[in-house]
Design a protein with these regions (language model features):
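Nucleotide and nucleotide-moiety/phosphate-recognizing core
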Residues: 2-160, 167-187, 195, 201
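Terminal amphipathic alpha-helical/low-complexity segments used for targeting or macromolecular assembly
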Residues: 203-206
């Protein structure tokens, strides 16, 4: 959706096309709180205020978390290259003011945390969380068109990635670092191995 004087509009890109080799199964299909993790994350993004949710998935027929969800699918036609191919397509296709990129395997993510990420200081500025472990480019808001232009420039002289785009944005002033305190840091912990999985989202109790 286009920029309006009284409203900042952002789309979301949910990254669900990874091969999940260490997990041994598709992370997006893990059942959490009674629904597939993919559907849970779509719900959280909607509650946070996303205008459109794009989903980057592995090549092949697009599954659907719910026939009622207003979502758009992006086929990852370059497996093994990480999140970049899906992010590039979404940056080019979205007509929102910004794109919030989210990895599907962050089970403790909350709509409240996502709203903080999607609340930049001003129009044209994105936000990227930073914990003591570093920047979190797979849960960050990238402003358009600056991020799209930067991604193409990076692709011309090296291997592009969300991290490189974010670092360039910080350097050029169109990405803002959002410090994350210890209480909120669990929202950014991902699941990588079978032992990490739980049918209850971390932090919600039994």
């Amino acid at each position: 959706m286009p920029w309006r004087k009284d409203r900042f509009c952002w789309d979301a890109l949910l990254l669900a096309g990874g091969r999940s080799l260490r997990m041994g199964t598709d992370k997006a299909s893990l059942v959490v709180e009674g629904v597939p993790l993919l559907q849970l994350q779509v719900r959280r993004l909607r509650e946070a205020g996303a205008s459109t949710v794009w989903i980057s998935h592995a090549s092949g027929p697009a599954p659907s978390p719910s026939r009622h969800e207003d979502i758009r699918w992006i086929a990852d036609g370059a497996p093994g290259l990480g999140p970049w191919p899906g992010m590039r397509q979404a940056l080019q296709a979205s007509d929102a003011d910004a794109l919030l990129v989210l990895a599907v395997d962050l089970p403790a993510m909350t709509p409240c945390f996502l709203r903080r990420v999607a609340n930049p200081a001003s129009h044209g500025v994105g936000r990227i969380p930073e914990t003591p472990h570093g920047l979190e480019p797979l849960c960050a808001l990238y402003p358009l068109p600056a991020a799209a232009v930067a991604s193409e420039a990076i692709a011309m002289d090296g291997e592009p990635s969300p991290r490189r785009i974010a670092i360039r944005g910080i350097r050029e002033g169109w990405m803002q670092v959002m410090a994350v305190d210890e209480a909120d840091a669990p929202a950014l912990v991902n699941w990588n191995r079978p032992g990490d999985w739980s049918p209850v989202a971390p932090g919600t109790g039994a």
